[in-house]
């Protein structure tokens, strides 16, 4: 009997979480023509201030293995009017640039995920709201979770 009560309570909690996520998605408009809406719901953490989410935007392209490439472009944070929720918009990726090391012309090309150039784009970790990114349909959005070490060190004076 206790197991049945536990399972019932667990199902109820899952349904509430799912309903909340669905309610939150009502705030985010559908993507426009030629755009895709990416959605990430991160799991709850005990201390979410110790985490960040890195948004990684790019395309998979067939290239040589030796050079370093990147796209021009940016990620812009916007706020959904009337809701106050953040969303992120990626415009068209600019031209691809890269190093020009001499590579064997007969070397096979490989599929590589080429990202936006510049610093990593880190955003606040928040399990209560979905992370929503609007991007062109030919662009991929990936992510990485960063976690801070609980150890804090003293910095020297000088």
Regions found by a protein language model. Give the residues of each.
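C-terminal partner/receptor-binding element of secreted or periplasmic proteins
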Residues: 124-158
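Sec/Tat signal peptide C-region and signal peptidase I cleavage site
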Residues: 17-21
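Mature extracytoplasmic domains of secretory-pathway proteins
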Residues: 49-118
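Compositionally biased, non-globular sequence tracts
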Residues: 22-34, 45-51, 61-70, 93-95, ...
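Short, surface-exposed loop/turn motifs at beta-strand boundaries within globular domains
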Residues: 31-35, 48, 81, 124-128
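Bacterial N-terminal signal peptides
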Residues: 7-15
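Short, well-ordered beta-strand segments enriched in hydrophobic/aromatic residues
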Residues: 38-40, 133
